[in-house]
């Protein structure tokens, strides 16, 4: 039984963490290295950094930040945002990231998944999917550009295609739940888990300890990602893991 992963997510622009992280002993709420080190101490299994500014001039800044973080922190790092080519992937992986996450660029050019997987291995390629329920169509619809643009893609079908092209992991955000603290969209992850055989990370909706228990006990996801509940100390990773252990969920 593989241990389930608890993964904080940090939004970064210009090499700074943008949603202030409210740890008690943090002097600089925007310093990615200090925040990553604090999360490592708390027992996070991985970290995801999303470059929300992601323009050409920010890419070098992002690589420099990854170098600094990876020199100090010894847990897997996934970097997403603005990665649109194999060269972008290479820059981030060389800087010390373990995985690169691609979202809009993969929808626009699915062959980018295959090219990245062939060059770096499937385990380095995470396809991030933003999905929202479309009641009229009776399916989860894929959105791109930070959730701004609807596509014609069905999220479950797109997940299957992404894996066939070489995605080694899926990071799937429920736009319906994101920021609501109403719990993870278990129906979405059940549908995905029945279709693909790579690790799935659930994102969007974490609000309390029971939400983590529910997503791991009712869906086959391998990891759960959250941002604000961890950043503002509403939940600690230690509490999440202790609760999961009590419920028989295997965690690191």
From Swiss-Prot:
It catalyses: 5-[(5-phospho-1-deoxy-D-ribulos-1-ylimino)methylamino]-1-(5-phospho-beta-D-ribosyl)imidazole-4-carboxamide + L-glutamine = D-erythro-1-(imidazol-4-yl)glycerol 3-phosphate + 5-amino-1-(5-phospho-beta-D-ribosyl)imidazole-4-carboxamide + L-glutamate + H(+). GO terms for cellular component: cytoplasm. GO terms for molecular function: imidazoleglycerol-phosphate synthase activity; lyase activity. GO terms for biological process: L-histidine biosynthetic process. Pfam families: His_biosynth. Coiled coil: none annotated. Signal peptide: none annotated. Its EC number is 4.3.2.10. It is found in: Cytoplasm. Pathway: Amino-acid biosynthesis; L-histidine biosynthesis; L-histidine from 5-phospho-alpha-D-ribose 1-diphosphate: step 5/9. The active site is at residues 11, 130. InterPro entries: Aldolase_TIM, His_biosynth, HisF, IGPS_HisA/HisF, RibuloseP-bd_barrel. The keyword Translocase does not apply. Keywords: Amino-acid biosynthesis, Cytoplasm, Histidine biosynthesis, Lyase. NCBIfam families: hisF. IGPS catalyzes the conversion of PRFAR and glutamine to IGP, AICAR and glutamate. The HisF subunit catalyzes the cyclization activity that produces IGP and AICAR from PRFAR using the ammonia provided by the HisH subunit. Belongs to the HisA/HisF family. Heterodimer of HisH and HisF. This is Imidazole glycerol phosphate synthase subunit HisF.
């Amino acid at each position: 039984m593989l241990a389930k992963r608890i993964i904080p997510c940090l939004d970064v622009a210009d090499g700074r963490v943008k949603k202030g992280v409210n740890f008690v002993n943090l002097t600089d709420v925007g310093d990615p290295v200090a925040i990553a080190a604090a999360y490592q101490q708390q027992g996070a299994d991985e970290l995801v950094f999303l470059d929300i500014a992601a323009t050409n001039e920010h890419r070098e800044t992002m690589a420099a930040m990854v170098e600094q973080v990876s020199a100090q922190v010894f847990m897997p790092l996934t970097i997403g945002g603005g990665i649109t080519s194999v060269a972008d992937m290479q820059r981030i992986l060389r800087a010390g990231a373990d995985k690169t996450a691609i979202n809009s660029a993969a929808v626009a050019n699915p062959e980018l998944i295959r090219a990245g997987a062939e060059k770096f291995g499937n385990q380095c390629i995470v396809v991030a999917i933003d999905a929202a329920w479309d009641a009229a169509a009776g399916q989860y619809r894929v959105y791109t550009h930070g959730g701004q643009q609807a596509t014609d893609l069905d999220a479950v079908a797109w997940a299957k295609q992404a894996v066939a092209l070489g995605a080694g992991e899926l990071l799937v955000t429920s736009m319906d739940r994101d920021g609501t603290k109403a719990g993870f969209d278990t129906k979405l992850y059940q549908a995905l888990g029945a279709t693909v055989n790579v690790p799935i990370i659930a994102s969007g909706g974490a609000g309390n300890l029971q939400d983590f228990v529910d997503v791991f006990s009712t869906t086959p996801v391998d990891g759960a990602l959250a941002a604000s509940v961890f950043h503002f100390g509403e939940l600690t990773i230690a509490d999440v893991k202790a609760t999961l252990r009590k419920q028989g969920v295997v965690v690191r």
